[in-house]
Amino acid sequence: MLEQIRGPADLQHLSQSALSELAGEIRQFLIHKVAATGGHLGPNLGVVELTLALHRVFDSPHDPLIFDTGHQAYVHKMLTGRSHEFDSLRKKDGLSGYPSRSESEHDWVESSHASAALSYADGLAKAFELTGHRNRHVVAVVGDGALTGGMCWEALNNIAAARRPVVIVVNDNGRSYAPTIGGFADHLAALRLQPGYERVLEEGRKAVRGLPVIGEFCYQCMHSVKAGIKDALSPQVMFTDLGLKYVGPIDGHDEHAVESALRHARGFNAPVIVHVVTRKGMGYAPAENDEAEQMHACGVIDVATGRATMVAAPGWTSSFSEALIDYGAKRRDIVAITAAMPGPTGLSAFRDRFPDRFFDVGIAEQHAMTSAAGLAMGGLHPVVAIYSTFLNRAFDQLMMDVALHKLPVTLVLDRSGVTGPDGASHNGMWDLSVLGIVPGMRVAAPRDGARLREELGEALDVNDAPTAIRFPKGDVGEDIPAVRRHRGVDVLAEPADGLSDDVLLVAVGPFASMALTVAERLRKQGIGVTVVDPRWVLPVPEVLTEFAAAHKLVVTVEDNGLHGGIGSSVSAALRHAEVDVPCRDVGLPQQFFDHASRGEVLADVGVTDRNISRQITGWVAALGATPADADEVSERLD
């Protein structure tokens, strides 16, 4: 049946039994396809019936469907004609793991940062009103987890202030708060599902208020009693008191019930909350039985067991997790903060070991940062573990609430640099540029697991400024020993005997391994290279300018945007120190990268050992540092 669905129109003629059969097909399709490619399995298994109902009730793309975060949009993609592309999910030039405007007119928003959908919906509804398209509904699907983000409530405050047709579907999978319970609450929900309820209620208001003398008093008394009952028995009051209609709670796996609720909500032609209770991982036992995350995201897995087909090598996140626990055992002042991601950021183990020193603040990065400031003011040392890309959300708080007060808060920036398959919104390629303008900020970029542990300890010893440690996604690799350490900077390689000090190659973090490969390739061409790892990359170590003065060319290699990156900072440091040595930088261009593997993205932008070797050879030849002809040497490097 799924093969016959080319678009939402193909759903309209299906019976309830056919829809039930289709839902089963969709789940099996998802399980087998995502098992082969990796992706967000649990969230999509939980929204099958909901997505079917949305596309039967609303006219996409005429009525925009906006999925908050977007990782639960796989079913939406299937119902809008993209089922045949799922073998390429999250692969280079393939199907994105999130909504994508370049893929389909049905995808309005492609940023996968949480808590933003309601603001998009508010803006679209205003635009439709101003341009005369009053017959268009805007639908935002937001999870209960995303509602922990303050931006949602800012948007709700605005949406509730006008009678624009915005339908907000709260996909409540029970992960953040319990569904409404109790007979009277069920009665209220049933009343709200009756087509004539709102009309009858309005007529009742008019009749009571029309009573001579006592009408308004009676109405206020009745309203207060009703409000008091709601406050006591139902969480819907948080929405209705804002002036929003409320429909629910609805069994999110009963397609007919969800569809009925959505049709009634559509008929209000005003802002309305539809509360849908779903189960993450629905229909796949390994996901339903995964108590920690219900298979929120997975790699390639065995369908029968739900287990990964390959044993993962030690990763950066686990290395950080182990180190933090060790430091936490020695120091009771260390506390940990996450913004709704204890597992992915490596804090689950710290939470289990030191539950009283762990704080999950929900999807609230701004609050996390300022709360950390308060903890530091109180004599503790907070460690805020966050994805690099989400740091952007809390920049003002970092600058004004933490750095201005010179507070000892340590940021641990996971998924820095190119992350790959999750696409543009998840690449952490701006953190060095952002952090570089924060006064007093100190940033470390460990090259391996041993340095991660060491630099974390050094950060925790800082008591008068914020610090940050950045590392990428993936395997941590083998430790890379230093030849020597000079005033805090590790020397990883020096020119071989007989070669001059031609190039100082400054490697940022894990790019140290690539830098050593480049140095070896250049050695074979008679070019002497010193490879250094600054360890603490911001501010630029003063000794680095002394290293530079002894060489003919400085080259920086970093997993960050070139604008405002370490290369820019090193160039500025050389100018300020009046060291007249040319500096070239290798890094990421200022653009949004499509989803692909990390290696594929880096290759596309020329950040490979082969290409860097070729570039340096040309730069050295242009300086006259060696007699070799640049083109001739480049050919030999190939």
UniProtKB/Swiss-Prot annotation:
Cofactor(s) named in the record: Mg(2+); thiamine diphosphate
Reactions catalysed: D-glyceraldehyde 3-phosphate + pyruvate + H(+) = 1-deoxy-D-xylulose 5-phosphate + CO2
One Pfam family in the UniProt entry: DXP_synthase_N
Family to which this protein belongs: Belongs to the transketolase family. DXPS subfamily.
Record GO cellular component, one term: cytosol
Designated name of the protein: 1-deoxy-D-xylulose-5-phosphate synthase
Record PROSITE patterns: TRANSKETOLASE_1, TRANSKETOLASE_2
Pathway: Metabolic intermediate biosynthesis; 1-deoxy-D-xylulose 5-phosphate biosynthesis; 1-deoxy-D-xylulose 5-phosphate from D-glyceraldehyde 3-phosphate and pyruvate: step 1/1
Species of the source: Mycobacterium sp. (strain JLS)
GO molecular function, one term: 1-deoxy-D-xylulose-5-phosphate synthase activity
Domain of life: Bacteria
Binding site for thiamine diphosphate: 71, 112-114, 145-146, 173, 284, 365
Key words, A-Z: Isoprene biosynthesis, Magnesium, Metal-binding, Thiamine biosynthesis, Thiamine pyrophosphate, Transferase
NCBIfam families noted in UniProt: dxs, PRK05444.2-2
Binding positions for Mg(2+) per the UniProt entry: 144, 173
Role summary: Catalyzes the acyloin condensation reaction between C atoms 2 and 3 of pyruvate and glyceraldehyde 3-phosphate to yield 1-deoxy-D-xylulose-5-phosphate (DXP).
EC number: 2.2.1.7
UniProt cofactor note: Binds 1 Mg(2+) ion per subunit. Binds 1 thiamine pyrophosphate per subunit.
Taxonomy of the source species: Bacteria, Bacillati, Actinomycetota, Actinomycetes, Mycobacteriales
